[in-house]
A protein has these predicted regions:
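A short, exposed helix-loop element centered on a Lys and neighboring polar residues
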Residues: 66-67, 111
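Alpha-helical segment proximal to the catalytic Tyr-Lys
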Residues: 71, 115-116, 187
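Conserved NAD(P)H cofactor-binding loop of Rossmann-fold oxidoreductase domains
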Residues: 34-40, 199
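Substrate-binding pocket helix/loop in short-chain dehydrogenase/reductase
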Residues: 42-44, 50-55, 159-160
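Short C-terminal tail/terminal secondary-structure segment
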Residues: 91, 179, 190-205
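Short, small/polar-rich loop/turn modules that mediate ligand/substrate recognition or access, typified
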Residues: 118, 123, 189-191
Length: 205
């Protein structure tokens, strides 16, 4: 039976925004953390404000949300936490250093915590997507168009060519993977970093 969906407009980078979200659902069994990534650039462009903003959005805010719901999950003996990070956590790119560094910081925090709460049937995993057909990729395509004079079709084709599957991922494919990790059937999977990259990652671990 499907429940009722409640939308909450909130800035997760603020205490008030996180409080508004938790007020709408104070005792969740499932938490999926996701936040806007910082814009690409070069190390010379990133000052203190840029670094602080990246870590607030992509490491600190998720960690604080996890802290807010974890005790309840442990008490109820069920919880599923999935952090949306990035494939570049394992395959960094210099232009994405802000995003990669902040999301990478969330990874060992989640891993360590997952070992503490696994006995309470609470799992914590990370999804590492790359090149899904979302607004983020539209933003990246526009940057390529502006910098290199490409058409939208050319920019998207170049993106697809970097993926072993030869195409961008579909949001529904991402949703299916996330839904499985949030399910009761995934209770023996925790502390993992699942690559969703069309087979592009070249490493073994």
């Amino acid at each position: 039976e499907l429940g009722t969906v409640h939308a909450v407009l909130a800035d997760l980078n603020t205490e008030a925004g996180r409080a508004a979200l938790l007020k709408a659902c104070p005792e969740p069994d499932v938490l999926v953390t996701n936040n806007n990534g910082p814009a690409p650039g070069t190390y010379a462009q990133w000052g203190e404000a840029e670094w602080e903003g990246a870590f607030l959005a992509n490491m600190i805010a998720p960690a604080l949300l996890i802290r807010s719901v974890l005790d309840g999950m442990r008490a109820r003996k069920f919880g599923r936490i999935v952090n949306i990070t990035s494939a570049m956590v394992k395959s960094p790119h210099p232009n994405m250093g802000l995003s990669t560094a902040a999301r990478a910081a969330l990874t060992p925090f989640s891993k360590g915590l997952s070992k503490e709460v696994a006995k309470d049937n609470v799992t914590i995993n990370n999804l590492l997507p790359e090149r899904f057909d979302t607004a983020r990729q539209q933003q990246m395509a526009k940057i390529a168009m502006e910098m290199r004079g490409l058409t939208l079709e050319q920019a998207r084709a170049e993106m697809a060519a970097t993926i072993a599957a030869g195409r961008l991922g579909q949001p529904s494919e991402f949703g299916d993977a996330c839904a499985f990790l949030c399910s009761a059937q995934a209770g023996y999977i925790s502390g993992q970093n699942l690559q969703l990259d069309g087979g592009s990652y070249q490493g073994l671990i």
